Amino acid sequence: MKYREILLDQLKDLPYFNKKTIYQLSEQYGLKSATVDTYISRSLKRKDIIPLKNGCYVSADFFDKNKNDTSYLFFIANVLRAPSYISSWTALQYYNLATEIIRVTTSVTLKVTRTYQTKIGNFYYQSIQNELFTDFFLVKGEFDFFIASPAKALFDLLYFKTRRFGGLNVENVKLLISELRIDFNEMDKNEREKFFTMIKKYVSK
């Protein structure tokens, strides 16, 4: 077995990896960095590994086994831009509160706004200030991920869509929720109350 195949075999069970991981594995075989870079280029060309962002990859084998697992996609979204959490339309769909089919995985981050278009999906990150980077939690499973509560997911969606609820009152917000076809009444009562508490400082009565 050639060194490139040996390295691929060692990487195939990782949910993601970066160049540093590959270099560390290659040290045991005394491979030079230039040689490893050639292996990476060749593996990308042969589609044995899939680029996620600059210097970050997943093996095609691992992705094929997990591509239908939503938790894996959310896990990768958290990894690509940290700190971040799943929110907005993506979280609302996760909670079965949105009727629209969502093609982009949307997250909220403390870093600058950014989009990653990858072969495993498109990831969109919206930047928010520290004081609003709240009300999300960790979902544990085979792939752990951070996601907004239902109330915060709706807050984040409308916060960015309306530019911080500019000029809106509570009735305007209710109408907008209806127009967006969000199943607000299906949301837990405590979450609905929490949402109205969240928007109180931004909207008029």
Feature map (PLM): residue ranges:
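Short gly/ser-rich loop at a beta-strand->alpha-helix junction or flexible surface loop bordering the NTP-binding
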Residues: 51-61, 73-119, 125-129
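Short beta-edge/loop segments at beta->alpha junctions of small alpha/beta modules
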Residues: 1-81, 119, 134
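Short, surface-exposed acidic
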Residues: 33-35, 100-103, 168
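Short aromatic/basic micro-patch
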Residues: 16, 85, 148
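Hydrophobic/aromatic-lined pockets within catalytic cores
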Residues: 27, 96, 159-163
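Hydrophobic alpha-helical interaction segments
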Residues: 134-205
